[in-house]
Structure formats: structure tokens, C-alpha cells
């Protein structure tokens, strides 16, 4: 294919030059995809005694007592997995809720499951220090004005990710960045017009599928002339938290939905109203669709339930293509499937469009029909 693959440590030396292990390389275009890494808080004894999402899967034995720092998606996923494998699990969460970037109703459902299954979630709690003790780890935890100790076998840190910007000498290339990563425009171009970036090093969406999508657009934009460049801001992002039940979302994040709620109409159905869910004794979850106020144009959606991650693809497609609830309501979904809850939620919108006079007319029509057979 004519692609040269060079291994080594690279850093920029100018706006169109970089150094790779002492060798200078010139470029017309460059792409930065250096990724990110788990953030480990600066807590005495933690860094040398913790697991992260990158080292967690190196475990070869099941720890009896397992502590997770952070109640976000990764923390909740691994806490749930370890509990079902048999560990006693404690989650330390500094705030007052888990999965605080998702719809609060979703977090409440997952929290209820955690409580039922014996996961100890401690809100308003912060780790102060970690000390090895007799082959285990003694953790000093602060809750309010009080401190106490908890001895565990393993500690998992799930407190977010940070971009790998330190060793690249971005200043030499005129590439601006901040604590969340490299600054990019809608075309994924940095402040140096020759250099583009994609993935965890520049994105608020730190998912594998997000990095792939961004790299796709960034590469095309780096190679194409200006009029043909693709607008990455137009892409709809979706994501899934793999707890049980799963939590899936498509569209702007919940924080944006909350800001726009005065301009949105929301339609919702509980998963227990879905026949397939009933046959499998599933009662936790919901489908919630947000539309532009006064219309059926879909803005965002959240689905909580078994296989929610599979169902959210339909909503991601609908939002991307500017579809409306009318089109979903008119489509025929197979019965009995969980995905049918999406169409039934769209039917809730359909019912909401019936005015009182229309309902009265329908009632009169039924009466007349019964009178005359």
C-alpha cells in the first residue's frame, strides 16, 4: 500500500516538522491520535497500589473485597461484574449519585439493583490514603467530618481519563490544548492548519466507536480541499453503559438536554409495558424520547433495559437522518421484541396530538356506529 510504519517516540519540533527518536521528519499534514490514559488522583499510596481500566484485566484471582473509586460508567460496570463474580464490592462516590452524566432515572435504576445485589455504594466519600497491611490494603476514607478505615484486597480507580499531551511538544507546532485535550474545530483541525487530531486526545466522548468515527472524518478532512470537508459537529453520538440493565443514550448528553428542557417535549414508556420484557420477567427500565417542542423531530433518546445497547442504534439513525416520531410510529416492528417499545413510545406522541374536540368526535362516531350496526 506504500505506507511507511515507523516505531518510536515522536515530538514536534516545528509547525511542519517532528522528531522521531532523533530523526527529523517533515510533513504536509499530520494527525495526532495519541489517545488518553486513566486518571489516578494524587492520593498517598494509591498510584502504586491500584488497578485501572487498563490493568484490571490482568487479575488472575478473584479478590474477596474489591473497592471502586468513582461511580461513573466504567466504575459501575466493573463493580457490577465483580459483585456477580463473587467479590464483596464497595463503591466510593464523591457526589450524591452514580452515573451522574446520564438521565438521573437511569442512575436510580442501576443504584436500586446495586443495593439489591449487595454492592455498598458510599456517597459523599473520599479516599484519603492507602497503606499496605498484611498483604491487603488499608484505606482511610473521609465522609463529611469523619474518617474511618476499610481493608480491601484490590482497589480499582475509575475517575475518568486524561489526554496524552505531555511528551508531544505541541507548543513547538503551535497546537493549543487544555486539560481536557487538544483544541479542534468542527473539521477536527487543530490551531495549526496542517495538523488534525482525533480520539481521546481531543474528544469529550471517550469511547472506542467515537475515536473511530472521529479518525474517519479527520483523515478525510486532512486529505480533502476545504469545500469538501466534513462537519464532525453534525455527527450524532451514542453510548452504552454495560450494567444490568444496560443504559443507552443517543444524541446530546443529558446536561444539554437539561438546559434545553423548556424547548423539548418528552415521551416515555416503562419497560414493563413491553410484552417481550414481561415474558422474561423484566420490569426495570424505560424508553424516553426527547423532541423539539411542538414537533415530533427527535433530538435525543435514552433506553434502559436488557439489550438497550442494541436498541439505541435505531434512535441514533433516526436522529442522524432527521427522522420524526411519525415515521417511527408508521413503521412496523416485529412482535414480540423489546425494540417495539420504541414504536410504542412514538405512539404516545401520536395520542398527544389528538385534541379534546377530536376525541369527542371519535366518541360520537363510535356511538353512531353502534346504533346503526
Give the ranges of each region predicted by the language model.
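Feature captures the FAD/FMN-dependent oxidoreductase FAD-binding
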Residues: 1-29, 121, 128-139
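Short, acidic, Ser/Thr-enriched surface-loop or helix-capping motifs
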Residues: 7, 185-186, 292-293
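Glycine-rich dinucleotide-binding loop and its adjacent helix/turn
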Residues: 34-94, 117, 171-191
